[in-house]
Amino acid sequence: MVPYELYDLALAFKKVKLWQKLMDSQLFAVRHSDGTTGYCCVMGMLGEHCALAVYPGEAGLNSCRKMFIDDPDLDVFDKHELNFSQDCVMVSYQLKGALNKREVAEVNAYMAERALKLRGKNAYPQFERFRPNCYPWRLSDAADQLHLREALEAALDVAAKLQSATPEQLGFTEGTLFERTIPLLEREGDAFRWSALELPAPWQETYVSPFIGDELSLARIGKSKKRSGSWDCSIFLHIKPASDEVEQGADIDELEEAPYFPYLLMIVDDGSGMVLDMEIFRSFDDLDALCQAVVRFVLDAGRPTQILVADDRTQAFFRNIASQLGVKLVRRRELPALDEAKQGLAEHFASSDGVAPARDVEATLELLSDPAIYSDLPDEVLTMLRRGVQAGALPDDIARMVERECSRRGL
């Protein structure tokens, strides 16, 4: 439960409307009582999302920097990953209907205790903990509550000083969050001591390049004559959250832990655009399991002629694996077949019930009903269709044609 003191401070912060004087790029820092540093961002100058976010330490600051990335070439999955890469504690102001049942109960109890009524646009404070690749969650950790309280107190001091000074006079600077100083506030008794803090250098993104440890399977792949086509590959963050508790039927507001967004590895046939395989994994701590999944797929579908990638993370993942498989790894600026497959996946999960549009299913079944197409399908596509047959997902007439062609090729 959020302490009532935080509600008091949040409502006081809302009254001073600091977002009318500071832009979201004009950060200030707070030296917390536990010795850590929080980087504070005031949002709302455009009137769309009024909030105060506290980013803990350099890791938090690095996630804040990502919020300012504006790349028109990012696809829906890239944008989603940026949006959910934040590491911060936030109080924002919402309509009552935007709060969940737990939050409504808490704010109602607070108002009853304080004999208050909240009125006006976006009058209700919402307290959230954002962690990278996780669903925004309730503010329950004592350290997070402390950091937000001290940031709100510092923000009120900033607002008071801006009554008689400009942001520039107080040391606020504009621009990208690199190579500049920002105000640092540190409590001394009942007041804050102000100084300047140099922003630390940004972190460089690093990605892991795992090896396949299963020597026996590598030997089997090396001896196999089964070949596949060119693979377009991408690792990206799923747009749908996952939770073991959700799978058991729990309501999201009642979960003990925040749902997380898993990663997906998508493999697409570069020639046909057919999705050959899709593996899901929770984090990059699961890379051994992902390598094993890749090995199983290569054994099933055949070794590709080449692996095509278009981003640093996927390139790093396949760097050693491609070498072990004896396959050329090629970096391309664009992979149209992969982009189309990812767009289709995004549209599928954007539907309210999570079911692919009926017209897409009908078009696929109509295509597979034509016997003439099977002789031109790559082996890996037939292998994938056979999995659908085994799962009972395809009509009998299509299943017979798939099995007949697989038998003809000795798959």
Segments from the language model and where they lie:
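Secondary-structure boundary/capping micro-motif
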Residues: M1-L411
